[in-house]
């Protein structure tokens, strides 16, 4: 089970809802992924205008936990305003904190992310900050009392996969709360690798919505995350420089 604050989930796949070709493909991809947490940018939805079509109209909101994010925020104050807007609309108190500090790389601003997380915790939110793979920042966020840490595998939408597995492994090893790898996942192999490192979950969007067949890719991501977690729990063999015979040699007789 993936436990975040008071919530428990069977699926370890968190799915973003943007950039799908149309609502039908989006819904089918969500269904086959079996994701229980769906994330979306509050700024890209007019959640107060009933005349504007949006994702929430099409979803059985009782079936999913919605994770609004603060994408578009440039500082802590903007992030808090967006989070309060989501809460006022009746959405979940759980919020993904996203404060971008660089428009080219879309990497998060560490100072403003820390500040926004602290402010939202004081407001009673369940806080999931999106961060870089900065080990020290992850520890500071943990000490602050956030409910999960979401380090990026690589820049948002890049599809580069996990470019710094060592840092991610350090973050996971020191964590006493869920670590959800977020951003940069490009393939099922990337998602499986994140889980093999010991991540508690993976959040992805573009890898599915931008695939040639988003529905098949959603299913592939589901299976790869399950396989990666199972492999982590099983425990891989140690790496060795030299070969080790896999067939027993003792107790065998050679018939001439």
Curated annotation (Swiss-Prot):
User: Could you tell me the EC number(s) of this protein?
Assistant: 2.8.1.10
Query: GO biological process annotations for this chain's record?
Result: thiamine diphosphate biosynthetic process
As given in the record, the signal peptide range reads: none
Catalytic residues, per the record, are 96
The UniProt keywords, alphabetically, are: Cytoplasm, Schiff base, Thiamine biosynthesis, Transferase
Please tell me one Gene Ontology term that the record gives under cellular component: cytoplasm
Q: What class of enzyme is it?
A: transferase
Q: Which GO terms describe its molecular function?
A: thiazole synthase activity
Asked if the keyword Signal belongs to this entry, the reply reads no
UniProt subcellular location: Cytoplasm
InterPro entries attached here?
A: Aldolase_TIM, Thiazole_synthase_ThiG, ThiG
Question: Which pathway does the protein contribute to?
Answer: Cofactor biosynthesis; thiamine diphosphate biosynthesis
Where along the chain is 1-deoxy-D-xylulose 5-phosphate bound?
Answer: 157, 183-184, 205-206
Gene3D superfamilies referenced in this protein's UniProt entry, alphabetically: Aldolase class I
What family name appears in the similarity comment?
Belongs to the ThiG family.
Q: How does it assemble?
A: Homotetramer. Forms heterodimers with either ThiH or ThiS.
What is its biological role?
Answer: Catalyzes the rearrangement of 1-deoxy-D-xylulose 5-phosphate (DXP) to produce the thiazole phosphate moiety of thiamine. Sulfur is provided by the thiocarboxylate moiety of the carrier protein ThiS. In vitro, sulfur can be provided by H(2)S.
Identification of the protein by name: Thiazole synthase
């Amino acid at each position: 089970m993936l436990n975040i604050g008071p919530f428990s989930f069977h699926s370890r796949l968190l799915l973003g809802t943007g950039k799908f070709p149309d609502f039908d493909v989006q819904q089918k991809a969500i269904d086959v992924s079996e994701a229980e947490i769906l994330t979306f940018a509050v700024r890209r939805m007019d959640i107060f205008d009933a005349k504007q079509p949006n994702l929430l109209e099409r979803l059985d909101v009782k079936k999913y936990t919605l994770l609004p994010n603060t994408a578009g925020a440039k500082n802590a104050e903007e992030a808090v305003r967006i989070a309060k807007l989501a809460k006022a609309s009746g959405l979940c108190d759980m919020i993904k904190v996203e404060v971008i500090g660089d428009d080219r790389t879309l990497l998060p601003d560490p100072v403003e992310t820390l500040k926004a997380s602290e402010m939202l915790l004081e407001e009673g939110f369940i806080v999931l900050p999106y961060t870089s793979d900065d080990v020290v920042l992850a520890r500071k966020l943990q000490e602050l009392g956030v409910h999960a840490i979401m380090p990026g595998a690589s820049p948002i939408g890049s599809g580069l996969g996990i470019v710094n597995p060592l840092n991610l492994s350090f973050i996971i090893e020191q964590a006493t709360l869920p670590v959800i790898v977020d951003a940069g996942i490009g393939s099922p192999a990337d998602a499986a690798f994140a889980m093999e490192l010991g991540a508690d979950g993976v959040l992805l969007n573009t890898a599915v919505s931008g695939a040639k067949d988003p529905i098949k890719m959603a299913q592939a991501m589901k299976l790869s995350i399950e396989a990666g977690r199972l492999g982590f729990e099983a425990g891989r063999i140690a790496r060795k420089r030299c070969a080790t015979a896999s067939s027993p040699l003792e107790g065998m007789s050679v018939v001439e």
